[in-house]
């Protein structure tokens, strides 16, 4: 079909079926060379603060399918901890009025400790995996229930209340974004994925044409999220046993 391609490694030849109207004699050919375009990383005891990106177009990052994935908590999710833009150990960082397109993996990954991250007014489309992932470290959860079949007996359970450490996003705002045509390569994805996080606000976003959930809350750690006034439609197009808004069970019970 038009737009499809095949690389014959033994012949070192790329075969491409051009779309109608494309002149190969004058076409521009671009090849991805990076999985992560920008990484903003501080230290847990010395976070990176007050960095803002505004009006930037992030495009053409490599695919990350079949890279090293890590299992998360109670759900069956595994995830690649990376994206075109990665924020880790940050405070008060902002992505505003940016465009993310033609990316092979996740677009934005808010990883481990992040306080007061804002993603506002951005456009995400033709994304290989998830648009926005807010994912803490499972070490922040006591008595980690990371598989269905793994059972923690009462005498082995950590009964201390609260997180085990600070390696998780909290008090972040995802607002007024347009997200569509994601999961072009991977299918266990979401427009907004929340896992091992606290007090995440997701509001006034439009999310459609996704293979799985528009918004997915992967576990019950640590709650306090506010999800309101989002427009989600044309979801769960390529998978099943899911929903436009999907959430999994509590982890501390």
State what each model feature region is.
Residues 49-60, 91-105, 114-129, 138-160, ...:
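Right-handed parallel beta-helix
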Residues 1-101, 140-164:
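Extracellular polysaccharide-degrading/modifying enzymes targeting complex plant/algal/animal polysaccharides
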Residues 2, 11, 189, 212, ...:
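Active-site lining segments that contact anionic ligands and/or coordinate catalytic metals
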Residues 36-45, 65-66, 83-89, 106-113, ...:
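Glycine-rich beta-solenoid repeat tracts in large extracellular/virion proteins
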